[in-house]
């Protein structure tokens, strides 16, 4: 891509004060925030950029979020076993949830994007928003330590915890879907990897779920196992709400 002396899109807002108000945190060293909001497409269009892209922070933020959610789950469900905790964690930190949280604070409007990414709808792309949210959490940690991050994670995910626990705790979506598929379709599900995307340190896998030749749903996750669970969950929701016919 051709470098330019022109500034590419630098976010829809004149400043980040609105974002800081939304997350309840003011940055002391704004370089961390600038990095969290900088997509790699922006660097491709800027000559001699002074800030790196947010992919390293995204990597770090994923680990920080996992730690915070794990700590929250252990605190609220001290008797739960590892399998149930893992399923609750997976449901809480899935891409869709992170993208919803990012949209709620209008994170996309503050991102530094290249012109091509802007034109292709990157400001509203859910995978991009989820990644930027993780980068933002890492920036907060580097600037102010774990305390403000945990406060924000508790505020964001605490209200979701009871609902997730009620629907997810102890539930294996693949097993439940297999039983329902056998009952309604007379066959076993099969899972097909249809897409792998993202940088090497943060791959996203998309899996489609079939019974016979019938495509019933798909899901995305950070591992093939997580993607299969997400696909099975979507299939169950469709079957249980009548959005899929009960006969082939």
From Swiss-Prot:
GO terms for cellular component: cytosol. Mg(2+) binds at residues 58, 131, 134. Residues 16-145 form the RNase III domain. Its EC number is 3.1.26.3. Residues 172-241 form the DRBM domain. The lineage of its organism: Bacteria, Pseudomonadati, Thermodesulfobacteriota, Desulfuromonadia, Geobacterales. Digests double-stranded RNA. Involved in the processing of primary rRNA transcript to yield the immediate precursors to the large and small rRNAs (23S and 16S). Processes some mRNAs, and tRNAs when they are encoded in the rRNA operon. Processes pre-crRNA and tracrRNA of type II CRISPR loci if present in the organism. InterPro entries: dsRBD_dom, RNase_III, RNase_III_dom, RNase_III_sf. It is found in: Cytoplasm. This is Ribonuclease 3. SUPFAM superfamilies: dsRNA-binding domain-like (SSF54768), RNase III domain-like (SSF69065). It is an enzyme of class 3 (hydrolase). Gene3D superfamilies: 3.30.160.20, Ribonuclease III domain. The active site is at 62, 134. PANTHER family: RIBONUCLEASE 3, RIBONUCLEASE III. Keywords: Cytoplasm, Endonuclease, Hydrolase, Magnesium, Metal-binding, mRNA processing, Nuclease, RNA-binding, rRNA processing, rRNA-binding, tRNA processing. Its cofactor is Mg(2+). It catalyses: Endonucleolytic cleavage to 5'-phosphomonoester. GO terms for biological process: mRNA processing; regulation of gene expression; RNA processing; rRNA processing; tRNA processing. Belongs to the ribonuclease III family. Homodimer. Pfam families: dsrm, Ribonucleas_3_3. One of its GO terms (molecular function) is double-stranded RNA binding.
